[in-house]
């Protein structure tokens, strides 16, 4: 797409149709909005965080937005291109449960070593609690990030090695539907 975000070429639309769950019309509509918000075709961390602040005005979404930004930014060039944006949106809004869980696993596995440690999960859960602020009432057994992480590890960490593999995460998510429900924070309702 060059330096300036221009109209999508037919081959770009076709490629995005193959890589996402969106139709040609939807891709063009999303691109139009993306170009309006990011005329240079690049969504920065600052811009991404502002979007989260609109959705979570009573908390501080900056830490969580940073974690999500890092997953969206597939090629790690410091910004989100339209293609990266649309592919992540496709998975989080229309992907299968397993695709959403793979995406979430990548989000939680902060150092990309193939495991989610207790500290990594605590970082993410703490960021989520900061983001939602006081707007969400949590049950006593989950009213702190530490309690939530302990509960998740009780359910998921089958071999008790203090780290979660993707298989443990997948199986645990099936046992604890609240994991899936948390993923629908990203869901546009079009799944």
Curated annotation (Swiss-Prot):
Residue stretches spanning the membrane: none
Role summary: Neuronal calcium sensor, regulator of G protein-coupled receptor phosphorylation in a calcium dependent manner. Regulates neurite extension and branching by activity-dependent (Ca2+) influx in growth cones.
Protein name: Neuronal calcium sensor 1
Additional note from the record: Binds 3 calcium ions via the second, third and fourth EF-hand.
Lipidated residues (N-myristoyl glycine): 2
UniProt cross-references to CDD domains, sorted A to Z: EFh (cd00051)
Residues that bind Ca(2+) 2: 109, 111, 113, 120
GO MF entries: calcium ion binding; calcium sensitive guanylate cyclase activator activity
Species annotation: Aplysia californica (California sea hare)
